[in-house]
A protein has these predicted regions:
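Active-site histidine-anchored catalytic micro-motif
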Residues: 3-13, 17, 21-109
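Hard-cation-handling environments
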Residues: 128-194
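Short, charge-rich amphipathic segments
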Residues: 34-35, 39-41, 115-132, 158-162, ...
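Conserved anion/nucleotide-ligand pocket segment
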Residues: 97-101, 105-149
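Short, structured patches in soluble enzyme cores that scaffold and shape functional sites
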Residues: 65, 86-87, 120-125, 180
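Acidic/glycine-enriched edge-of-secondary-structure segments
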Residues: 1-13, 177, 188-194
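Short acidic (Asp/Glu) and glycine-rich catalytic loops that position anionic groups and cofactors
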Residues: 79-84, 119-123, 169-175
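Core alpha/beta catalytic barrel or barrel-like domain that forms the active/cofactor pocket
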Residues: 29-32, 118, 168
């Protein structure tokens, strides 16, 4: 355990970026979201940013992340949608992948032009307090899902990330990420409400 060695991270990024071609319709990143490297506090954000630089603004990038991800502004500004697990213990990875695929279909068909809003809270609770069947995190996740339903098709995704306390990085802390279908203000308002 510990930070990823720079040489290993650089090799991974080089292989991933070299594999991207001009005929790609979309990118799906399935990461944990709390990666740390010897030379980077936010490797997940770095990867998303470098992919965005290589493929340009028109190719959608979607990301599914563990509920314990440490979310950065770089991640949120580099991708079109972030979809986080809603359960701890994690039992909904498959459903979040389906949700990301459904969202991608909407984006590719022109039914959505996603806008991502991110609010970081100055809290970094320990993992034991992040159970979702009971307790405050589960209640907030449930409330976010109810608000998404109330707003109808205006919101594509509401994800609340508890953080990964063992990663001693500036990105650590609770994050609320809301993706609106096409209106940043709606996403930002809901993220701030939550």
């Amino acid at each position: 355990l510990g930070p990823i060695q720079k040489a290993v991270f650089d090799e991974y990024c080089s292989e991933a970026l070299d594999a991207l071609t001009d005929d790609i319709d979309a990118i799906y990143l399935c990461h944990h979201g709390a990666m740390v490297a010897e030379h980077l506090d936010d490797p997940d954000g770095y990867i998303a940013k470098e992919i965005r630089k290589k493929i340009g603004p028109k190719v959608p990038i979607l990301m599914t992340l563990d509920l314990h991800a440490n979310i950065s502004d770089t991640m949120c500004s580099s991708v079109d949608l972030i979809c986080g697990y809603r359960t701890n213990p994690h039992v909904d990875q498959f459903e979040r992948g389906q949700e990301a695929a459904f969202s991608l279909r909407q984006i590719l068909s022109g039914q959505a032009n996603p806008k991502v809003a991110h609010v970081k809270l100055p809290l970094a609770p320990s993992s034991i307090t992040l159970l979702t069947a009971t307790g405050p995190l589960g209640e907030v996740i449930d409330y976010g899902q109810r608000r998404q339903a109330e707003l109808g098709g205006k919101i594509m995704n509401v994800s609340i990330f508890g953080n990964f306390i063992c990663s001693d990085v500036p990105e650590n802390g609770i994050s609320i990420v809301v993706t609106a279908r096409n209106d940043f203000d709606i996403a930002k308002n809901l993220a701030e409400e939550l």
